[in-house]
């Protein structure tokens, strides 16, 4: 069963449409997957739905809720295998069977070990014709955050940097306002909305005193602000600490941090996260594992060169966005996106795959995934 997939152009068309619907959940459903569903009868869409926010109805149930027509004998396209367990919501397989759906076209099997293939099995036992794997590569790319998180319980890490044409993230004086233009900075706000956590090192907090919130108009889910700060040096008067009651803020530190300072931070609403120590600094692998355990499935790394270098050296970066501004600032003391000693040979350089390049205002945005 399922070996000879009878996939038509129509199947691909409707699955891609379901994928577009799924994307509407971006920034709202984490750590759940992005899922879209479409109900089709005689080549015509009669209902659609997507997973809109965490804890809300799944895509399939939203589609049924939105449906004004008879679903008996119809086909459902869903980007991810319907769930078959009672979680925050009842299983979707029940709804599919109850509504008399005759054929289900599934994009991806659920990578969650508690589900994997069981939902499809239940549908087939109920006499429903199930096709699996339509547009699966595109869907894996769309749900790359969820796929890594559900399999490893480790957050997906995206490194963002903005640099001049000669690779500087600030002038030698430390001044960095602004490397890129308004459209690029606006794009960064869009990106911040997408991920569950924004991360910087203590050096960035001292140098820039950032807010690290998402400043888009309208309703957005604010990311958790995370500072990698071994000695808990972050200033009590910094924006991150003074706004911690409003925006969830975590300071990751090691055991040698001053306990009085940690108590003061806690009193201001900052969550303190004790991590293992590695060479006098926070062990980033341990920190990511702990953040994953807290339900944080993705990190937008906006750190300085030191933190970026630690992540890169430990193979912790999954994806890169690099904004390059058409300007030269010079200076051998001027900071670069990745500091440290670096690799000795070009053959050791970390390469990107699936590279995309676009103009954002006057700046160039290079985006790619890290070769694994």
Name every feature range the model reports, one short phrase each.
Residues 1-5:
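Short, Lys/Arg-enriched N-terminal segments with co-localized hydrophobic residues
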Residues 7-17, 21-25, 30-32, 71, ...:
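Enzymes that bind and transform nitrogen-containing heteroaromatic metabolites
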Residues 18-22, 42-49, 138-151, 241-245, ...:
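A short, flexible N-terminal coil/short beta segment enriched in small residues
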Residues 27-29, 56, 120, 134-162:
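Proteins enriched for Cys/Gly/acidic motifs involved in redox and nucleic-acid/cofactor modification
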Residues 36:
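Helix-turn-helix
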Residues 39-139, 224, 250, 257, ...:
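Zn2+-dependent cytidine deaminase-like catalytic core
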Residues 102, 128, 153-155, 196:
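Short, well-ordered coil/turn segments that N-cap beta-strands
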Residues 112-116, 132, 150-154, 177-181:
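Short capping loops/turns at secondary-structure boundaries
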